[in-house]
């Protein structure tokens, strides 16, 4: 979740989205920003209805065309010409290749990475970059990341995987970008316990965890 000038924005809403919001005591939410259309990243969208009710407004949803196609399929009742009371109310905004504004004078820059053959979006905001579900990243897209001070990147496990960075690939990418700090996310149960992971990581690289808070400039 990004907390910017008193407003909260989440990147992706997976199956445990509702529980995450309750645990972190999130009272308001300005927007949901999607990286891609896989179920573990979109299946919590229905639960924005609680914020609709509490804040008396539509939820801003940012997604590219391929994600919007999936949302229309999975949540057809949200987009139907005739709807029933209580459905989630969303205001969908299309992510193109250019940077876009999510708060006053605050923009996100989309970064295309490849999740095997599926394009997935990472995002840069100021000196912070978040990337999930990456297996390869083009040199052109890497240029958007250079200069990042805080890098969040996926590292599924130690052994190779078809569509995700493993530990070796993630560490190689981190070394190439050379941020001040890097955090590993999208870690599977096949990896190890957090303390054991941290024990073998290079300096200034850490395993992320639920509830972790990272200050950054935007």
Regions found by a protein language model. Name each.
Residues 16, 38, 135, 156, ...:
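Catalytic metal-binding/acid-base residues of hydrolase active sites
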Residues 138-218:
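Binuclear metal-ion centers of metallo-dependent hydrolases, dominated by the metallo-beta-lactamase
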Residues 110-111, 131-133, 153, 185:
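Thr-Gly-centered strand-to-loop micro-motif
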């Amino acid at each position: 979740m990004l907390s910017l000038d008193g407003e909260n924005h989440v990147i992706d809403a997976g199956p445990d989205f509702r529980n995450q919001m309750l645990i972190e005591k999130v009272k308001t939410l300005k927007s949901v920003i999607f990286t891609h259309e896989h179920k573990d990243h979109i299946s919590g969208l229905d639960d924005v209805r609680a914020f609709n009710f509490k804040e008396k407004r539509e939820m801003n949803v940012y997604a590219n065309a391929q994600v919007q196609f999936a949302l229309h399929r999975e949540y057809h009742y949200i987009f139907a010409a005739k709807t029933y009371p209580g459905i989630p109310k969303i205001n969908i905004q299309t992510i193109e290749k250019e940077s876009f504004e999510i708060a006053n004078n605050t923009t996100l820059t989309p970064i295309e990475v490849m999740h095997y053959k599926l394009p997935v979006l990472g995002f840069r905001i100021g000196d912070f970059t978040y990337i999930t579900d990456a297996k390869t990243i083009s040199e052109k897209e890497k240029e958007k990341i250079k200069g990042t001070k805080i890098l969040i990147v996926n590292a599924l496990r130690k052994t190779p995987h078809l569509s995700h960075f493993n530990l070796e690939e993630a560490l190689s990418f981190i070394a190439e970008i050379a941020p001040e700090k890097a955090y590993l996310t999208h870690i599977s149960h096949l990896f190890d316990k957090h303390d054991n992971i941290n024990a073998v990581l290079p300096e200034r690289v850490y395993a992320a965890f639920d509830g972790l808070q990272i200050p950054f400039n935007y």
